[in-house]
Structures are given as structure tokens and as C-alpha cells.
Amino acid sequence: DYDGPALLANVSVSRMRTAESRMVERARISMAMDRQGGINRLEMDAIAGKGPITFRYMPDKPTMKMVLKIQAQDAGAALQAFGVYESVRGGQLSIKGESKAGGDQKIIRGKAELTNFRVVNAPVLARLVNALSLPGIVSLLSSNGIDFSRLESSFVWEKRKAVDMIHIDDGRTSGASMGLTFEGALDRMADTINVTGTIVPVSMVNSLIGNLPIVGDILTAGSGDAVFAATYSVKGSAKNPTTMVNPLAVLAPGFLRQIFFE
């Protein structure tokens, strides 16, 4: 009996629609699907914005794992093209993950890294910063944007017919203006978000606290490390979630060094 894939496809197009009013160029796609409509292999090479994007989801025969690899040289354009996130500009994206050997092939565990990018017109982040009464950073978000040097996170992605869930753990990002941690879940099927974390406004409040003779030494343990921070939560509809901020958190210097990849 034939037990091969139900569909094998190889496509090359000059322009490919990826989301509403979004395109990538010079796309080459190779795909294999099973008889239930599941994807056994998907390879894509294309141009998104100013750079190439590569996508690989395929079996690794020696380990019996499904392997996911995504690379984008213009991360912002790639994220916009596939309807993931609209507010990133530039940057380099790397995502690597794999399933358990002999385990559930629909669950991928891995890490994501985004470097040298800018965030502009991000309403949720603007709400968090606005709650901390930092108008300078809010103004940056709505104009030139805020530069971040690095973002990284662990993730577990479960993708089935009725489930499309991404669990995020140990997320952190930092730049000259702020650092953030984040963890939680994105339900792509229900289009909801449930994320909590810590936000550290570096350039303003922390420099002020560090310069206070007595309070500054107490809060920074005399090291000059900034420890003023706020905890936050973002929950509800991904398009218009509810945000909550507690601006009275104090962090140990070691935790701050972790946020800023030191």
C-alpha cells in the first residue's frame, strides 16, 4: 500500500501574498503534506523588506525530531509580512526549535533571538510606559521609536487543527531606554494574550535614583546599578488587551544584570 505524502508541492513566484495587503518577493516554497492535511515538511526562501528570510520545518532523520529554523535579516519586515507584529523596524531574527525525539511532533520547543531593532507606535508598550509617568519614552515610541539591542526568549509552540498556542518563558529585552522581562502565553486561535513581566526605565528614573546620596546607595546597594522597576500584566484580546502596572517593585542588582545581558 502507498504510504507516502498526500501532497508534494514546489512553487516559485516573483511575489507572494502572505497576509492582508502584505507580500514577500522571490519566494521559493517546497512542501509535503500528509493525508490528514498536516505539514510534514515546509521550506521557504524569500525576500522580506531589505533582506532574505528562510523558513525550515522538516524532519531530522538521525534524531527522529521535527526541526524548526527561521532566519530573517530584516526582522521587522518579516514580522509584518506574516502578520505577526507591526511595530518592529529592522533587526535580525533567529528562531530555532525542535520536537522531542519520538514524541509529539506538533509541539516545538526552542529559543528566539532578535537583535538591533527598533519599536515604534506600539500601543501596549506605550500604555505601560505612560503608567510610569515617563512622557519622554512615550514620545519616543510615537515618533522615532525606541532602540533595543537584544531580545531573547524560550518558547513552546503547540500547533494542531484546533490549537495554536505559544508559551513564552525567560523572555528579556534591553536597550538604552529600558529593559523588560516577559513570560506567558499567546493563544493564536482565540487571538488572546496573557503575559506578565518587569519593566525597568533605565535612562530617566534610574539615573535620578542613583544620584541620590542616601536613597540611591540603599536602592542600588552602592553599586550604581539601577533597581527601580515596575511589574506589569497584559491580558485579554491581542488587539486591545488590558494592561496593569505596579510601579513599586525593587529589584536586586543581579537581576538587572540578567535583564541587560551583562
Please place each PLM-identified region on the residue numbering.
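Gram-negative outer-membrane assembly/targeting C-terminal domains
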Residues: K239-E262
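Small-residue helix/turn framework positions
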Residues: D3-M23, R28-K235
